[in-house]
């Protein structure tokens, strides 16, 4: 189990997350990198930032382990997942806009899995492999009234059912961040 917790800020100019294991120990962090002063200013005064490119680094104690890039978007999002050296692992592609949101997990041009929202509210997601078997779940946790009203910080529990092969394992790690940057950051607060 992993808990991905967005850092609480009243005004959020960059995305930052802490990653905890099942026993509550911080095992990593995720930081938004490469954001110019102009993009930060745009994020402060408008919501146009949601349409621009975002770069996130997933880090452990030794340094970056994954790099996620969400290219500029108009309607549907996609997130490119790669190693810190630039080696591509795959991409997470939003398959639909209306109804229960779904993302396809694609590696080397083939479908290796999917992320499926369980309802229109998009708080609970099932992650499946290419055969449609659930391999993990993402659950958005309610932050409490004050945190919800005054910040954009969200928390996600990622429950992986068993050890997964690559690139699916890395795609599952990237999934909660994809849900947050592709869906949740776009629909509230200063984002």
Question: Where are the language model's segments positioned?
Answer:
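Low-complexity or membrane-interfacial segments used for flexible interactions
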Residues: 1-55, 61-64, 71-78, 84-89, ...
């Amino acid at each position: 189990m992993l808990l991905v917790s967005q850092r609480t800020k009243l005004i959020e100019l960059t995305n930052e997350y802490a990653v905890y294991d099942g026993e509550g120990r911080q095992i990593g962090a995720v930081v938004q990198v490469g954001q110019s002063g102009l993009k930060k200013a745009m994020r402060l005064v408008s919501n146009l930032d949601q349409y621009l490119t975002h770069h996130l680094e997933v880090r452990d104690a030794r340094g970056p382990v994954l790099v996620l890039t969400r290219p500029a978007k108009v309607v549907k999002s996609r997130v490119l997942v790669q190693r810190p050296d630039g080696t591509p692992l795959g991409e997470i592609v939003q398959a639909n806009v209306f109804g229960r949101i779904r993302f396809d997990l694609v590696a080397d041009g083939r479908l290796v899995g999917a992320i499926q929202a369980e309802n229109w509210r998009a708080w609970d997601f099932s992650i499946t492999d290419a055969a449609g078997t659930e391999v993990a779940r993402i659950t958005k946790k309610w932050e409490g009234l004050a945190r919800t009203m005054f910040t954009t910080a969200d928390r996600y529990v990622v429950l992986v059912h068993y050890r997964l092969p690559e690139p699916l394992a890395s795609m599952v790690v990237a999934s909660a961040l994809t849900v947050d940057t592709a869906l949740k950051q776009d629909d509230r607060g200063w984002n």
